[in-house]
Amino acid sequence: MQPVSQSSAEPGPKIPVRTLGRQLKATYGRRLRRVMLDLGLTCPNRAGEKGFGGCIYCTVSGSGTGAAKRLEPLQAQWEVGLKRARKVNPEGQAAILYFQSYSNTYPDLQPLADGLEQIRKWASVAPILSVGTRPDCFSPKAAELLARQTEFFKEVWVEFGLETADDNVQKIIGRHDTLQSFHDACALAAEHGLQRICHCIAGLPGEKPGGLLRQVDAAREAHVEGIKFHQLMVLRRTQLANLWTAGKVHMLDAHTYADMVSEALEYLPPEVVVHRLVAEAPKEEHLAPLHWPARAKVHTMIEKRLTERSSWQGRLLAT
């Protein structure tokens, strides 16, 4: 695995957050762009094993590109993604291969295994492989399959949806997973030398005050290497859209969200890479929150809150 450079990404008074962009530049000398790959799979809370319809905030494309539903082969998906990545890095290493949509280790491993066999030839250009899945869909065989990919890629990440540390909220949002399965999956991935990234959502229906802090606590206890922060968003073609239209969902404003994330960061270990500070969706899909600033502006708001109080990622862990 590629050694991680600490110096130029280390959080402190001048650099308040260890962002992925900073970490990639420290490690690879450049930023790498994700190339989204879609295998056209599903999730247990869509297929009937744990429910139907999926999580209330998830679109019919599984929060991905929907390319597989359009019958686009992986080669075509790669070519489109690489073209975009080459705008940033015209030569050499340029990309992160990211299996994003749905749960990529469910219902069985054969589609993922076939996909991995296809994409290995791109490892010289895309040194990092990232695979998203639910914690309750991550088995020892899945861990072994991904661990074998370290022969081809410099880094292999597995991205687990945590979303909330409250099992009751898991039920409210139709996810039907548990905090314990998150910890079990993270432990299993660690045993196989895989880097763990967790997704956290702020503002879910039923979430109690301090919910984002509890998610960071869970991430810290699981010793994850990376984390993504998302504000709750209402997208078209989701169950959440119906609830929002009926006035049954409260949305966070950008200032409240920036307050929540900046506070949570102070309790996040400084070595954890922050892969995302704020989410963004295509304008044609986005319904709410309304009047939300551009992603870069919210990013700046979060870091500014930290610098204004002379703080940074992980500063309060020692107090």
Which residue stretches match the model-derived regions?
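Auxiliary Fe-S-binding modules of radical SAM enzymes
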Residues: M1-R22, A26-R33, G226, M233-T319
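Alpha-helix N-cap and loop-to-helix initiation/capping positions
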Residues: P73, P111, I173-S181, E207-R214, ...
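N-terminal [4Fe-4S]-dependent radical SAM core
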Residues: M1-Q93
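Conserved C-terminal portion of the radical SAM core fold
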Residues: Q180-Q239, H255-V278
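Hydrophobic faces of well-ordered beta-strands that scaffold small-molecule active sites
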Residues: R33-L37, A95-Y98, L129-V131, V156-F160, ...
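Core AdoMet radical
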Residues: S61-G81, A85-L109, S124-F138, E155-S181, ...
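Distinct, well-ordered alpha-helical segments
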Residues: L109-E117, S139-T150, L212
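Structural recognition of alpha->loop->beta junctions
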Residues: C55, I119-V125, R214-K228, V298-Q313, ...
